């Protein structure tokens, strides 16, 4: 069988809607399209290109039925010359055309993926190179040619081996022409390929050998292109240089060569550029400048390596020129190494520390030798060489490049202008820091025990000043200026005396010059000082006291923008001018906020050494974010002023927040963080809460910042003081699935684990909470779903309260999370580990949670006592939530191939297997109430309401109008209900009685409420209720699921048309095959093979009814005009319990028949007489609970016709043609239904039966048109 695919065929500017036929050769169809478009050329030259995919259609996609090669459905296929013919045509034009640019433009218009591959294979590069090497090629022509060569270079079939060296020479010679950007782009492609780089370097070296001065290529690109005003040229040029440095075999030497052309000073003048792409290239060049230092720091010192030995000899010969080198000697200790053998001290920084010491000794020998000439006392020993290695470590961490991934292409690290001053800028910074270190060591009169304090103080000052300086001289002067300011600030803090203490003052040489007595005032404030400036808030807490007097201290904080911050403590006045009648001293201290930074310097030392120290004009932020740093610490009695200064204050605020913490809390952008803060210094620092910047970012920052931190050298396994890891905070927030998955991957990459399972169950060491339970606590359904997607198997980890994830979700009453957890393996039977509470105890028997926890064991009492406002659980919205027991019925008759019915034996010994006994079958013995308009009916009896009424009746009631109900119960529990309605609406109620023979008579009316449509959910079971086997559901079984075979239900119905006076039988799609019955003069096409079908369809005979009545108690039926509802006869089972069910229907002349599993009949049945069809104002509705359409059959209007029993000929209708059509439709439908049953019964003759079924349905459709 052939299939067609709808496509749009395009040729030049024309397009047609056509089909591609599968199974037909593509060449044949292309020939047809060429004829449609009137193409004169040979069709074999043409191909069909799928425009969206950029691929050509092949026979593979045409002939293979299930081919997944390409999807061309509804796509545009362009009819064009095949790739081979296109290339041949273009090459022919390039060879013959004298206009080189025109031929190149033609070539550029064909540069598709397939064309480029074919162009390279056919030697097209030779033609292109010939144009480039041509002397007559203009600059514009070369620009187009270089652009085409750049495009071709990205395809796999391309190799730089195909390109000759003269072409590369032509490319290099055009680097200096600013308007020829393609030459620079082509140079970048060359520099990123090993073969291309070699050819590029050969061309540059060749030019360097033959030219001098400004004609040199490096001079052109450094002094010409980088100094130009075209930002694109600058970016491309610097990109080329960076690529050449990266692929160079000796990058350090290559950079030295570039420095001879003053590239650093040229770039330094361009640092103010704002273009992101250009600034990124500047940052990459800075990384190349410091890569020597980074590489040396990662190269461990090896005393057995000759090159390393020579470096150590260089240091010895510089410091001790008159002595023979010795690897182990006490001179090494004299200059500051820890041991006689210095090799062990280089373990931290490798060769970088050694090279810096060599540079210092060679260029600033006087600084190196001063500690040796002026030897400090043993207590003040200055480990000069060791401090030099520590300074090297600081510089490496300070300037170390950050990791920039493809996801952060716009992220640029910190650019230090001072590094672009000269080639040795970094070495000179090192020398300045060593000088400052010595100054601080002397001023502090430091000992070896506080070495780390001195180092932290110096490194804090350097990290603050370094990004702001443009040259080494400025760097040195600014640091010295800050040191002097701190000395002045300390001196200005001294106040009048209340208590005295003695302190020793040391001179510069460390000797005691004098002993002085200093009088200080104890001033400690408890006043909280809150500030609002650039989004930061800090507080100052302390107590105000003095020894002799009660002092009122007023503090006024003013800023340049006019804002005022005041601190008010106990018994304090906030007025600047205070009159104290009690002669109390009032101290008014004005503090100025300059540039949003607070300086608080009103603290003095007391005899006990409780001091408040404030510092950091930078506000603890390199970026100048305006955060306020006020540090409160307990310091020891100092010998000099500078020792009282807390070292951490220059970088850390009182709450322990580093500048990186402050930037995160102030919601700074990633660009501001990377540009304004040296993140390498603070990545793993913790504040007073134990939060690292990553942990803090996972709590409040956007995903981009978290992603960036995870790609740096941060440790994601440092917990906070509350035990939460960064991943806990990460899971407590909402992310997209892609963000969450990538974040988990980055966390996983930094751990030793290899599965998501270990990260998901990472435990808080304080509360024992996992990230999953943290997400549940915060109600974050998205994160819970993501976690379960990554790790579906949930282990029942218990927290410190004994709860697992499911317990927490239940306590939070989050139905969605509870469902997700159970679906992913959470066990509802596990109790609380400590309190032993079960899940049901935790949910307090909440019905909705109980259904989720245990849908199959929900008790009927819980269901019946639920609120009336609760959602009705029916088959559509709570399938399987309540266990429903069907009424016991005989098994389904089995179908044989000869269309005969064989009834299977029932579980009862008195099974009814003949036609007469089938009249006793309980077809509609118990009618369940159903409300078509979704109303809540609270009835103990089954009521059908189609008029939007809510009924609360405990008897047989008619809800619509004023009806009188007389309930008469006879000894056989048969009640006759006479209902009088003002609208002449009568309800016929037949009580179906089940008689049993076990001598058990019940005087109560038992109700079976097994239908899912029972609105009040009452559930009263019969004492002797046997379930029908699931493989053979009864007719009145309340649920027919999709798994139930069609052949297992037996429901039929009655249908008549306005043109036929006699009702005829029509079967439902689930009825067994019919057998023809010729008992009457006229054949009626109905299922008349059993008394059961006769009973249901109203074709009763006197003999069957008499036999049926003999086996039961008297079943009386009364009928009247108007609307009616009917119940079928009772069945005689082996029980002696009488069950009375009353069905009342009153619908304002609406005839409603409710039968479970069967189509209702549209008239009243008098079991001893004929059948009454409803009055001519009756609307017949059939409500059924079977697998067929749950709705009403079309309404047919009767004519008050009375039918005759079986055997009496039906009166012919007036319109014979329509009547015949009706009969034919019934016959065809019966045949169709029988064929359906045969098809479902087995595979025998299935194709033949399907064919017959199609023919029967087509014939039926033709007859319906005659209606």
Swiss-Prot record:
> Low complexity bias: where?
507-598, 859-870, 895-908, 924-1033, 1108-1176, 1184-1213
ANK-type repeats, residues: 655-685, 689-718, 767-796, 801-830
For the region Disordered, give the residue spans: 486-598, 854-908, 924-1040, 1057-1082, 1103-1215
Question: What PROSITE patterns has UniProt attached to this entry?
Answer: ANK_REP_REGION, ANK_REPEAT, ELMO
Stretches of Basic and acidic residues bias are at 486-496
- Name its GO BP terms in alphabetical order: actin filament organization; cell motility
Q: Name one Pfam family in it.
A: ELMO_CED12
Q: Which Gene3D superfamilies match?
A: Ankyrin repeat-containing domain (1.25.40.20)
Please name the InterPro entries in this protein's record: Ankyrin_rpt, Ankyrin_rpt-contain_sf, ELMO_ARM, ELMO_dom, ELMO_domain-containing
- Composition bias, kind Polar residues: at what positions? 1057-1080
Repeat among the record's keywords? yes
Which UniProt keywords are listed?
A: ANK repeat, Repeat
Q: Which GO terms describe its cellular component?
A: plasma membrane
Where is the ELMO domain positioned along the sequence?
307-466
Output this protein's name: Ankyrin repeat and ELMO domain-containing protein D
């Amino acid at each position: 069988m052939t299939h067609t695919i709808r496509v749009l065929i395009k040729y030049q500017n024309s397009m047609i809607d056509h089909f591609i036929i599968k199974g037909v050769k593509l060449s044949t169809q292309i020939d047809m399209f060429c004829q449609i478009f009137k193409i004169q050329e040979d069709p074999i030259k043409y191909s069909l290109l799928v425009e969206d995919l950029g691929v050509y259609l092949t026979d593979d996609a045409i002939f293979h039925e299930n081919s997944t090669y390409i999807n061309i459905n509804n796509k545009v296929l362009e009819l064009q010359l095949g790739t081979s013919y296109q290339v041949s045509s273009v090459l022919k034009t390039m060879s013959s055309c004298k206009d080189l640019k025109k031929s190149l433009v033609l070539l550029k218009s064909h540069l598709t993926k397939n064309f480029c591959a074919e162009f390279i294979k056919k030697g097209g590069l030779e033609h292109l190179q010939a144009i480039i090497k041509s002397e007559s090629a203009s600059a514009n022509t070369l620009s187009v040619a270089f652009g085409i060569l750049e495009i071709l270079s990205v395809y796999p079939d391309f190799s730089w081996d195909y390109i000759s060296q003269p072409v590369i020479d032509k490319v290099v010679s055009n680097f200096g022409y600013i308007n020829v950007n393609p030459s620079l782009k082509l140079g970048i492609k060359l520099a990123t390929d090993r073969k291309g780089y070699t050819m590029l370097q050969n061309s540059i070296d060749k030019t360097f050998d033959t030219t001098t001065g400004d004609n040199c290529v490096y001079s052109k690109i450094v002094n010409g292109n980088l100094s130009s005003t075209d930002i694109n040229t600058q970016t491309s040029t610097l990109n080329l240089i960076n690529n050449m440095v990266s692929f160079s075999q000796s990058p350090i030497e290559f950079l030295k060569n570039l420095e001879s052309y003053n590239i650093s000073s040229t770039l330094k003048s361009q640092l103010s550029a704002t273009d992101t792409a250009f600034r990124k290239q500047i940052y990459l060049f800075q990384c190349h400048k410091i890569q020597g230092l980074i590489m040396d720091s990662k190269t461990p010192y090896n005393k057995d390596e000759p090159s390393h030995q020579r470096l150590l000899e260089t240091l010895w010969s510089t410091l001790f020129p008159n002595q023979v080198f010795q690897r182990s000697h006490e001179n090494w200790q004299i200059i500051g190494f820890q041991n006689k053998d210095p090799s062990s001290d280089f373990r931290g920084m490798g060769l970088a520390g050694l090279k810096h010491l060599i540079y210092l000794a060679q260029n600033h020998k006087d600084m190196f030798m001063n500690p040796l000439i002026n030897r400090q006392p043993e207590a003040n020993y200055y480990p000069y060489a060791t401090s030099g290695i520590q300074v090297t470590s600081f510089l490496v961490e300070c300037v170390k490049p950050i990791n920039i991934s493809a996801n952060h292409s716009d992220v640029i690290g910190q650019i230090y202008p001072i590094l672009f001053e000269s080639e040795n800028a970094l070495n000179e910074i090192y020398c300045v820091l060593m000088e400052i270190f010595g100054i601080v060591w002397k001023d502090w009169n430091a000992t070896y025990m506080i070495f780390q304090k001195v180092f932290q103080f110096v490194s804090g000052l350097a990290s603050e000043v370094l990004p702001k300086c443009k040259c080494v001289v400025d760097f040195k002067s600014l640091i010295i200026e800050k040191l002097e300011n701190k000395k002045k600030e300390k001196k200005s803090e001294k106040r009048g005396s209340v208590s005295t203490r003695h302190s020793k003052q040391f001179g510069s040489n460390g000797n005691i010059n004098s002993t002085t007595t200093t009088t200080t005032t104890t001033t400690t404030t408890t006043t909280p000082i809150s500030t609002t400036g650039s989004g930061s808030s800090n507080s100052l807490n302390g107590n105000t006291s003095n020894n002799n007097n009660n002092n009122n201290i007023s503090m006024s904080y003013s800023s340049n923008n006019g804002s005022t911050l005041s601190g008010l403590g106990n018994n304090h006045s906030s007025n600047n001018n205070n009159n104290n009648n009690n002669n109390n001293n009032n101290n008014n201290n004005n503090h100025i906020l300059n540039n949003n930074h607070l300086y608080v310097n009103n603290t003095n030392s007391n005899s006990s050494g409780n001091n408040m120290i404030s510092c950091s004009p930078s506000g603890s932020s390199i970026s100048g974010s305006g955060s306020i740093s006020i540090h409160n610490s307990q310091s020891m009695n100092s010998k000099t002023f500078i020792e009282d200064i807390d070292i951490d204050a220059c970088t850390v605020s009182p709450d322990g927040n580093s500048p990186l913490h402050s930037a995160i809390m102030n919601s700074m952008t990633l660009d501001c963080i990377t540009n304004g803060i040296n993140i390498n210094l603070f990545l793993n620092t913790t504040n007073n809460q134990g939060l690292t910047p990553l942990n803090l970012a996972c709590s409040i920052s956007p995903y981009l910042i978290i992603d960036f931190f995870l790609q740096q050298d941060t440790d994601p396994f440092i917990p906070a003081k509350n035990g939460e890891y960064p991943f806990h905070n990460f899971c407590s927030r909402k992310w997209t699935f892609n963000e969450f998955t990538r974040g988990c991957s980055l966390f996983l990459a930094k751990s030793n684990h290899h599965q998501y399972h270990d990260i998901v169950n990472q435990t808080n060491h304080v509360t024992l909470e996992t990230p999953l339970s943290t997400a549940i606590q915060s109600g974050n359904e998205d994160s819970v779903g993501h976690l379960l997607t990554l790790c579906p198997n949930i282990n029942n980890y218990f927290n410190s309260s004994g709860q697992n994830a499911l317990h927490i979700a239940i306590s939070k009453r989050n139905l969605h999370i509870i469902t997700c957890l159970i679906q992913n393996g959470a066990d509802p039977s596990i109790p609380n580990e400590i309190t032993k509470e079960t899940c049901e105890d935790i949910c307090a028997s909440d019905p909705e949670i109980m259904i989720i926890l245990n849908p199959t064991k929900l008790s009927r009492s819980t269901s019946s006592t639920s609120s009336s406002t609760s959602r009705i659980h029916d088959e559509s919205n709570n399938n399987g939530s309540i266990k429903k027991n069907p009424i016991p019925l005989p098994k389904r008759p089995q179908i044989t191939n000869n269309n005969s019915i064989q009834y299977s034996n029932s579980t009862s010994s008195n099974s009814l297997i003949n036609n007469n006994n089938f009249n006793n079958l309980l077809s509609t013995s118990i009618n369940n109430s159903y409300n078509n308009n979704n109303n809540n009916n609270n009835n103990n009896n089954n009521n059908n309401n189609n008029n939007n009424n809510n009924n609360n009746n405990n008897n047989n009631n008619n809800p619509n109008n004023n009806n009188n109900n007389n309930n008469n119960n006879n000894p056989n529990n048969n009640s006759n209900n006479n209902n009088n309605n003002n609208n002449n609406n009568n309800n016929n109620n037949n009580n179906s009685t089940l008689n049993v023979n076990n001598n058990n008579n019940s005087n109560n009316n038992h109700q079976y409420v097994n239908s899912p449509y029972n609105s009040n959910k009452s559930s009263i079971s019969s004492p002797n209720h046997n379930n029908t086997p699931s493989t053979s559901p009864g007719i009145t079984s309340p649920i027919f699921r999709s798994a139930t075979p069609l052949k297992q239900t037996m429901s039929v119905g009655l249908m008549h048309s306005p043109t036929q006076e006699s009702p005829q039988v029509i079967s439902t799609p689930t009825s067994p095959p019919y057998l023809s019955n010729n008992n009457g003069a006229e054949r009626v096409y109905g299922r008349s093979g059993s008394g059961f079908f006769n009973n249901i369809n109203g074709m009763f005979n006197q003999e069957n009814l008499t036999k049926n009545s003999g086996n039961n108690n008297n079943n009386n039926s009364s009928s009247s005009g108007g609307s009616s509802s009917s119940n079928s006869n009772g069945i005689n089972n082996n029980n002696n319990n009488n069950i009375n069910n009353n069905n009342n229907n009153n619908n304002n002349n609406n005839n409603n028949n409710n039968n479970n599993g069967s189509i209702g009949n549209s008239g009243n049945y008098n079991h001893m007489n004929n059948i009454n069809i409803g009055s001519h104002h009756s609307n017949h509705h059939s409500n059924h609970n079977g697998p067929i359409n749950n709705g009403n059959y079309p309404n047919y209007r009767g004519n008050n016709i009375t039918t005759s029993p079986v055997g009496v000929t039906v009166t012919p209708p007036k319109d014979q043609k329509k009547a015949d059509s009706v009969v034919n439709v019934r016959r065809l439908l019966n045949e169709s239904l029988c064929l359906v049953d045969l098809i479902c019964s087995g595979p025998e003759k299935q194709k033949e039966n399907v064919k017959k079924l199609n023919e029967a349905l087509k014939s039926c459709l033709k007859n319906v048109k005659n209606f």
